């Protein structure tokens, strides 16, 4: 696949530095790439420089955390002005919120007999490349494995860090509506990340998409890495029903993970592709 609109670097919870990630994407045949780190724009300049040297198109990207219906939701933004005041302010708030969240996760783990989690997760993060951002849940998970509290990252998420568990701290995120508004005001195209990852009933997922459209969302991510084909089919049906654009990406975090950069299931051919719009500036008032 020569377009990948979802991947992560060491600027957030990925394992590869932005320039290394871009080089890997190029080797895998990707020619249009968006780096979508969690709640930070920190890796974009390095990624853009690397992409330009290889003749690739680097689309500004970010994956913002927000809340809806008591759950943490992720929203992808593309093609925005990196210096737009609304986005810069939102990123600063999220940066602070992520540190508060990491401190809270560490406190909770300490009460369960796992002291030193923040320092340990930070050490894991710094081994990959220090970003100055708070360690994320994968860093905590890797620390738990290293300390022998769990056997692997999957167990860490299943028992301690996943949705609804002790480490699922979300009160530091803005609302879905505010997040979409921030992205729109910054000139972004907006896509709802991996709608099937949320543990929702069918009716709640439909309500999420309806509210997301009401907030001004443009697209949904119908393909996320190697997610099951039946999920892609169900999301495609929703995209058709709601008249949405669609995006797709590997959600690559690092070598040896569940996905590879530039690899994901095919997008159903009849769906309108978000990346087909990137040549045109979104008209914020009317799109």
Where are these regions (language model features)?
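Charged catalytic cores and adjacent phosphate/nucleic-acid-binding surfaces used
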Residues: 1-9, 15-30, 42-83, 94, ...
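Short, amphipathic alpha-helical segments
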Residues: 81, 92-103, 134
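A short beta-strand/loop micro-motif in the catalytic core of glycosyltransferases
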Residues: 34
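Flexible, glycine/proline-enriched loop segments at strand-loop-helix junctions
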Residues: 88-97, 127-130, 166-167
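Conserved acidic, metal-coordinating active-site core of Asp-based
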Residues: 130-195
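Conserved phosphoryl-transfer catalytic core
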Residues: 96-128
């Amino acid at each position: 696949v020569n377009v990948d609109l979802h991947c992560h670097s060491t600027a957030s919870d990925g394992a590869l530095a932005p320039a290394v990630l871009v080089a890997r994407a190029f080797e895998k045949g990707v020619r249009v790439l968006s780096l979508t780190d969690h709640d930070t724009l920190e890796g974009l300049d390095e990624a853009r420089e690397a992409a330009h040297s290889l003749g690739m198109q680097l689309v500004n990207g970010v994956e913002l955390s927000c809340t809806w219906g008591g759950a943490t939701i992720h929203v992808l933004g593309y093609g925005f002005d990196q210096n737009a005041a609304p986005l810069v302010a939102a990123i600063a708030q999220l940066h602070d919120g992520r540190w508060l969240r990491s401190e809270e996760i560490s406190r909770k783990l300490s009460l369960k007999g796992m002291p030193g989690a923040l320092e340990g997760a930070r050490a894991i993060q710094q081994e990959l490349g220090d970003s100055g951002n708070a360690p994320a849940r994968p860093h905590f998970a890797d620390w738990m494995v290293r300390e022998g509290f769990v056997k692997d990252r999957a167990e860490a998420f299943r028992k301690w860090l996943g949705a609804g568990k002790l480490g699922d701290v979300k009160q530091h995120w803005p609302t879905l509506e505010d997040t979409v508004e921030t992205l729109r005001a910054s000139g972004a195209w907006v896509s709802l990340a991996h709608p099937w990852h949320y543990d929702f009933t069918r009716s709640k997922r439909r309500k999420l998409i309806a509210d997301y459209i009401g907030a001004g969302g443009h697209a949904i991510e119908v393909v996320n890495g190697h997610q099951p084909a039946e999920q892609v089919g169900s999301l495609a049906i929703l995209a058709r029903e709601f008249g949405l654009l669609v995006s797709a990406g590997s959600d690559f975090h690092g070598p040896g993970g569940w996905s590879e950069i530039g690899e994901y299931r095919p997008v159903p051919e009849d769906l309108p592709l978000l990346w087909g719009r990137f040549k045109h500036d979104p008209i914020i008032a009317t799109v």
